[in-house]
Amino acid sequence: MKRSSIVLGVALGILTGVAAANEETELTPVERGEYGPIDKDTSTVLYERPIQITDRVYSAIGATQPETFENFGHNNNLTFVIGDEAVLMINGGSNDELAAAMHEEIKAITDLPVKYLVSENGQRHAVGGNHYWKNQGVELIGHVDAADEVEHYGGQYIEATIRQRQDENYPFTLVDFDTLMEDSIRLDLGGIEVEVRTYGPAHSPGDVSVVVPSDNLVIAGDLAFHIRMPPIFDETDTAGWIETWDVFEQEAGDMLILPGHGGPTDMATVRAGTYDYLIFLREQVQALLDEDGTLEDAYKIDQSAYAHWHTFHELAARNAGRVFTAMEFE
């Protein structure tokens, strides 16, 4: 009887261990904490409160992971520049609640009004909270291509926000930009002038960067990546992105770089995280095309060298497939 009890106990222990292992493997990389805490600061809807980047620039660094209910859609950087007379905000946030929380953080640092808001592109986390800022009298600025993106995908943005907030009645209103730009625009904040410009095709239509010469800083937006794998969309022109990079590096090589995701870094780091990855992926796809490889082969390209990047599991195979599909017709 005692021997049977021991055997039964061992068996139950093994089964419990297997069940626990299975449960662990069913968790997503986000749930396993592979991309950092699921929510870094539970005292605010922001994933993280703003930190000082340079003398005049602060940024609330968003989660380098897909959006979740817990991170409130704060998975990009929400940045602001303080002049002597006014403040420039970069990115409206995913929703009005994030925007309002960000505004409170700004008011805790300066009494100056937010005069301008620049959306780094037309993605939801860049424009979703613009409704709040417009109601504060802030001038909304975006690229003409970003405006087209919002018009085209607006319905999907509403649906995605409702899913992310898990509330069918969650208030979400998209608004138009007040000022549309193409190549560049200069903004006077009093005491300093910043340039909002496009370096060329990059990650998403309408991608713009903000150059702050006084602080030797480029708020690069989604032109540059490092800790997070660059997402490649159906409309992403990877060949154009590589050409754009040459211009970007030539002009901003000695400047501090604040990407759209992740903290500030230098040009060498974002080059490795962006340009080198694009070159690698295109070379791998070209080798497949030369051998009459298929889309299925593209999905299997070995990208394990980049497995340490956040969102690798979500994006690696998808990126390869999209590059393959695009290069078939180049």
What residue ranges belong to the model's regions?
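Metallo-beta-lactamase
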Residues: 52, 86-88, 94-96, 147-199, 213-214, 244-245, ...
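Conserved beta-strand hairpin/beta-sheet module of binuclear metal-dependent hydrolase folds
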Residues: 55-105, 210-212, 217-221
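Bacterial N-terminal signal peptides that target proteins for export
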Residues: 1-7
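Bacterial N-terminal signal peptides
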Residues: 7-17
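Active-site metal-binding motif and surrounding structural segment of the metallo-beta-lactamase
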Residues: 84-88, 96-141
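Acidic/histidine-rich helix-loop elements
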Residues: 60-76, 150-152, 227-238
